[in-house]
Amino acid sequence: MSVNRILVINPGSTSTKIGVFDNERPVLEETIRHDVEQIGKYKRIIDQYEFRKETILEVLHSHGINISKLNAVCGRGGLLRPIEGGTYTVNDAMLEDLKNGFSGHHASNLGGILAYEIASGLNIPAFIVDPVVVDEMEPVARISGIAGMERKSIFHALNQKAVARKVAEQLNHKYEDLNLLVTHMGGGITVGAHKKGRVVDVNNGLNGEGPFSPERAGTVPVGQLVEMCFSGEYYRDEMIKKLVGQGGLVSLIGTNDAIKVEKMVEKGDPEATLIYKAMAYQVAKEIGGASAVLHGKIDAIVLTGGLAYSKILVDEIKERVDWIADVIVHPGEDELEALAEGALRVLREEEAPKEYVVREKETVARG
C-alpha cells in the first residue's frame, strides 16, 4: 500500500495543534503554544494566519519534516455556511467565507486558510473535514414551537463522525449502513441520531439545548429564563455566560472539573452525587428521545469524549439506555487523527472530495 503523508492543522485560540501522518500512523504530533501578547497584536483572529503559518513551518523544519514530501494538508473546519458532512476541498468560496467570518469569528476559521496557504505552495490539495456547522437535519427536526425560530445543527461533528466510523468498522459494517446514537461528552454534550451516515437530528450543544454539561446549561425552564432575562439584574453577556461557560456543573457545584466532582461522589458527598446523577439522567433522556427519531431501530449507542472516561457517569447512563441497544464506549477524542482520516479517505479514493458551494440567494448564515 502506498504511503500518503498528510499534515493536519487544528488552530485554537492560543495554540495550534499540528500532526504529520503517514497514512494512519502519526509521525509527529505537537501543540504549539502562542505568546498571548504576540497574538494580541492582531486586531482580528484571521490576521494571525501568516504568523501561525511561519510558526508551523519552523516547527516542521525543526523536527526534520520535509514538506515537499507531503501529499495533502488538512485543516480543522471553521464557521462556514451549513454543509453536509464529509471532506471538502478548500476553494475560493470557502476562503472568502472563512476570512469574512460568515457564520462567526473563531480560531478554527484559520484551519482551512492555513491548509490552503501551505498546500498551494506545494501544488497539493488542501482539505477540511466535518466542521461544527455540519447540517444534515431532516426538515421535521428543524421545527420549533415559535415561527421563525428554527432549530439549529451545531455539534461535535468531527469527533462524532470519526468515532461512528470506528464503531462501524468494529461491527464489520459501513458507517453508511448503520443507525447509531452517538453521544459526545466534553465541555458540552451532544447526542446525534446517525441514520445511514447522516446526522438527521442532534441537540444544539452550544446554545442551550439538551443535557447540561460541565460548563453549559442545556435545556432550562424557558419561562423562568425569560423572567431572569428581564429582571434587570443581568446584562445580555451575563445571561449568555449562564448558558455557555458558567452553566452546568460550574453553576450547580462551582467547578467544570468532572474528575473533581467524581471524587466528591466517591467520598459520599450527597449534593455532588445528586448533580452527577442528574447529568447522567439528562444524557440518558436525550438518548432515549433520539432513539425515537430512528424508530427504535438502533445498531449501537456510542459514548465518546472526555467524560466517557468516567466509569460512574457511563455506568449511570448505561443502566438507563442499554435496553435500547448495546452501548459501546470510545472515550476521549483525537481531532488530529480524525482530520487525517478524512483526508486519507479522499486520497485513497474511498470517497470523493466535496465542493463548497455558495448559492446566490444565501446572504446570511443559517445557524
From Swiss-Prot:
The keyword Cell division does not apply. It is an enzyme of class 2 (transferase). The keyword Kinase applies. Belongs to the acetokinase family. Its main location: cytoplasm. It is found in: Cytoplasm. The gene is buk. This is Probable butyrate kinase. It comes from Bacillus cereus (strain G9842).
